[in-house]
Amino acid sequence: MSDEQGWYLMQQYQEQVEELYGQAELIERLVNEYHRTVETVQELSDIPSQDTLIPIGGSTFVYGTLKDTGKVLVNAGRGILVEKPVNAAIDTLNKKIEELKKSQESILKTAEEIKGKMDELAQKMSEKDVQIPQKED
């Protein structure tokens, strides 16, 4: 492998690692959102009926009334909503959280494997006394 090829491969590895970390961060945000949703569903299930504000987007709200807090609609995929009792909905949300965490672990493992390849390549290049240019921000 030429010096230029080694440097190019190192750059590709770095970009892959950054992309994977970005995906892991997005998953972390989704996990946090699901945790907040579980908390909200639990809190609302204790309230029999209540007037509330409903967000409709763009920091705009409408008045509404929570009528039946014992059931919630959960996205089953492909835009299909399924009505579930609170406990079943919470179980579904917790399963989604676990799936997301497994995906995140897999992504982070892949990133670490690529970083290992980067370390090996850097070692080989340093043995050849190749100077790796620093990435400019």
Predicted region positions:
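Intrinsically disordered, low-complexity regulatory regions in eukaryotic proteins
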Residues: 1-76, 80-137
